[in-house]
From Swiss-Prot:
Highest taxon in the source lineage: Eukaryota
Keywords tagged on the record: Endoplasmic reticulum, Heme, Iron, Lipid-binding, Membrane, Metal-binding, Microsome, Monooxygenase, Oxidoreductase, Steroid-binding, Steroidogenesis
BP-aspect Gene Ontology terms: glucocorticoid biosynthetic process; steroid metabolic process
Domain remarks: The leucine-rich hydrophobic amino acid N-terminal region probably helps to anchor the protein to the microsomal membrane.
Enzyme Commission code: 1.14.14.16
Subcellular location: Endoplasmic reticulum membrane; Microsome membrane
Name of protein: Steroid 21-hydroxylase
Position of the signal peptide: none
Cofactor: heme b
GO terms for cellular component: endoplasmic reticulum membrane
Amino acid sequence: MLLLGLLLLTALAGARLLWNKWKYRSLHLPPLAPGFLHLLQPDLPIYLLGLTQKLGPVYRLRLGLQDVVVLNSKRTIEEALIRRWVDFAGRPQMPSYKLVSQHYQDLSLGDYSLLWKAHKKLTRSALLLGIRNSMEPLVEQLTQEFCERMRAQAGTPVAIQKEFSFLTCSVICCLTFGDKEDTLVHAFHDCVEDLMKSWEHWSIQVLDIVPFLRFFPNPGLRRLKQALENRDRIVEKQLRQHKDSMVAGQWRDMTDYMLQGMGKPKVEKGHGRLLEGHVHMSVVDLFIGGTETTATTLSWAVAFLLHHPEIQQRLQEELDCELGPGASGSRVPLKDPSRLPLLTATIAEVLRLRPVVPLALPHRTTRHSSILGYDIPEGTVVIPNLQGAHLDDTVWEQPHEFRPDRFLVPGASPRVLAFGCGARVCLGEPLARLELFVVLARLLHAFTLLPPTGPLPSLRPRSHCGINLTMQPFQVRLQPRGAVAPGPSQHQ
């Protein structure tokens, strides 16, 4: 049976390749990279950038039964996602996407349509209008509580990634459900962690490339389905509680706002309507997109500052000048980040070097289009290599070096693309930037970051085979400002 399946798969692949070659014979397509095992490269975004030396910034890769187009420069990414955004606003329909998104009722994974636009409008309104007044004070409050917990562990090695993860999960729980109770935060944190681990497993990645394999036994697929059942059970419980207790015309949090606003974004007749399932998946998007991503960026920032204590010292001097010396209660200047220019530049540099979703999520062309004179047929899967664009030495001077000062001169450096751009830009970008700004300001104002005994944390990402650019686990010691620093022997 297995042999028969493999023979059939080979025959289908050959037929598909011959059909595509005949179908697109008159088009000027991007050059095709030789080989078909590209996804096995340990540092995929850097590998894809390296292919530009021979192929240019736009080329094709063969993945399974289809070719995908890779965009490796800021110019090509912005041309596709901003200037020709309608052409490139689609999402490919892959087996794991269908499972994770409840049949594409999801903003991140759903295909472009009038219903998708209405869904996006509702979720964006909930973020920007429904909780606008509570977002900043909430992030400030939870960050202060986080710093107090860290003060209780002062001087001892702390697994800062895990602490950041619980902090960002608490923020999302409060904004989405109006609740930061530890049991709920831990339940959602563990749920998201389990889901992402299952989704990024190699067996699911292979399934997306060769969908035919879903007909064969797959323990990884079974684990993913179990993680999704657990996710949906937790979210549905919260939705029931909100429906039973909410008051019409009032909203306590984003869930209230979205449940009451489902019918407000008008969708043309015949294009469907927003249902509770769309609210369900908006909640899922907020947790997946707003927990580990922000926590990982904060962790990268700490790791870079451990390697560059001179930058940390300059940041603390800037914070002392603006907020006063020591861990004072002065408010972080959220309305005018330019008052902390080095902090703003440091965040931009971390996002440039380590965009958490380095290959974004794949796009799909909704109609025939073109990039740099190359034809891009309708239905083509397109991968924006965000990290590759950030490391392009024709755009950035010494692109692999951590140099926040490059962003201190207005207009001297391009805008980073870490949150994507165009119609598919991350809706949570304002919240993520707020958290990065407040947490790093408070953390560096209250503590000096010191390495534990032993080597500094690795700045090399883990081998990239999933969605997020993760880092090696590490620990940090948080020395309260003004306290006596440890001796030199402890700074090895």
